């Protein structure tokens, strides 16, 4: 794999963390980086804030400190935090059924699905029973009606399967019914705005040309499903080993909006999949968690408890065992994202990753625009950077087991 021969690294890096800058540059020279940024706080101090490369494939738009990049499922960490804040404030109860707040959702055997089940990807509500055209997915109410009417794909609470797209719709509808705000509005007014963090779910069209990086090399949903050998329209998860993937990824192809109308996709709100963020924004967000500005330590200790062990995920398969799910966050059960197996955060298809480490007081964010969908949320471009942060803190790093997953 080749890379850029010469790249100018912008930003700042405390002397103790200079190896992060070195590896960040090597991402461009050796690991095929196009445009990217990394930021990290340690004990509340910004120690790394670097960016470089191009925000577009033609090299005409230099990456800036506040360049926004899509993090796809990294959005879930933002959305989960909003829900946990509401729960800690007493505005909702995660143990109650979703139908307590959204009565229509209780149809078709879903009456006992709790918010906690959704957070843990154990509700079975991974998609409706019929596919939707990408234009239909721009209609929030229509999607919610389809989800409310659908039977779960397994008995709620008995198995684990990644709620790839439905996660954002289910939690988003509950947040709206409780607060009167969308998740994007709540995130802006109650979390990101007060922090000054550049993390957004929904970016106005007129801001996108000079703010947003273009995704490069990102496969479409159809390409990924075809590559995985997934069936087109399964009626049961018993139909095919990839039936769960086909349902969760293919039912409501909000990603196909990005393929057909990228501006529209960024402008809409999909609280599970389309946040536009800067690396500094994500590091600021997760640092606020470390500093207990958003949630209490008691809540954070609960949300990072492994849910369902490391059983095979009915959507993503056995590879999930390497990280495992907490209550709305990706964990680090096997240590593929650094030495602390108690971090919590979320990665996104393509390589982005952000996390909070309460033990070592780290808030970390890495974003990029050249996609590599083979690394399953342990992209070497990010892992080498976060590992250097740990090394600077004197934390031993075990050798990384290089893995490319075959679904």
Each model region followed by its residue ranges:
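Catalytic loop of the DD-peptidase/beta-lactamase superfamily, centered on the K-T-G motif
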Residues: 2-54, 159, 176-194, 206-407
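Hydrophobic core segments within long, regular secondary-structure runs in both alpha-
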Residues: 21, 116, 141-148, 386
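Amphipathic, well-packed alpha-helical segments that form the structural scaffold of globular domains
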Residues: 25, 99, 123, 148-152, ...
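Short active-site loop at a secondary-structure junction
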Residues: 26-39, 51, 58-118, 155-165, ...
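Active-site helix/loop module of the DD-peptidase/beta-lactamase fold
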Residues: 65, 70-74, 86-126, 130, ...
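Well-ordered alpha-helical segments within folded domains of soluble proteins
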Residues: 79-80, 167-172, 281-284
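Internal, well-ordered domain-core segments that constitute the primary functional module
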Residues: 130, 160-173
């Amino acid at each position: 794999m080749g890379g850029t021969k010469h790249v100018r690294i912008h930003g700042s890096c405390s002397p103790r963390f200079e190896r992060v800058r070195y590896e960040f540059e090597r991402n461009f020279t050796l690991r095929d980086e196009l445009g990217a940024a990394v930021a990290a706080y340690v004990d509340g101090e910004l120690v790394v804030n670097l960016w470089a490369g191009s925000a577009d494939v033609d090299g005409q738009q230099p990456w800036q400190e506040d360049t926004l990049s899509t993090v796809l499922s990294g959005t879930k960490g933002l959305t989960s935090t909003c829900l946990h804040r509401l729960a800690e404030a007493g505005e909702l109860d995660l143990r109650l059924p979703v139908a307590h707040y959204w009565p229509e959702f209780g149809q078709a055997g879903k009456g006992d699905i709790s918010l906690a089940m959704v957070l843990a990807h154990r509700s079975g509500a991974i998609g409706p029973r019929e596919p939707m055209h990408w234009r239909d997915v721009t209609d929030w109410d229509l999607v919610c009606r389809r989800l409310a009417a659908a039977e779960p794909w397994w008995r709620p609470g008995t198995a684990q399967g990644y709620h790839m797209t439905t996660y954002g719709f289910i939690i988003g509808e509950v947040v709206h019914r409780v607060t009167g705000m969308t998740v994007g509005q709540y995130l802006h007014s109650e979390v990101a705005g007060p922090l000054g963090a550049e993390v957004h779910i929904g970016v106005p069209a007129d801001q996108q040309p000079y703010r947003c990086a273009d995704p490069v090399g990102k496969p479409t949903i159809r390409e990924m499903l075809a590559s995985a050998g997934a069936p087109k329209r399964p009626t049961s998860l018993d139909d095919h080993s990839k039936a769960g993937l086909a349902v969760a990824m293919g039912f409501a192809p909000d990603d196909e909006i990005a393929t057909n109308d990228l501006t529209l996709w960024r402008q809409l709100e999909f609280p599970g999949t389309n946040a536009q963020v800067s690396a500094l924004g994500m590091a600021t967000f997760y640092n606020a968690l470390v500093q207990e500005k958003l949630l209490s330590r008691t809540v954070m200790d609960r949300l990072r408890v492994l849910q369902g062990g490391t059983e095979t995920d009915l959507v993503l398969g056995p590879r999930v065992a390497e990280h495992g799910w907490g209550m709305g966050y990706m964990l680090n059960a096997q240590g593929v994202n650094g030495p602390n197996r108690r971090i919590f955060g979320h990665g996104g298809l393509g390589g982005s990753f952000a996390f909070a480490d309460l033990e070592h007081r780290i808030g970390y964010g890495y974003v990029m625009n050249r996609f590599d969908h083979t690394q399953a949320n342990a992209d070497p471009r990010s892992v080498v950077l976060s590992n250097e942060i740990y090394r600077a803190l004197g934390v031993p790093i075990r050798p990384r087991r290089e893995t490319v997953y075959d679904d």
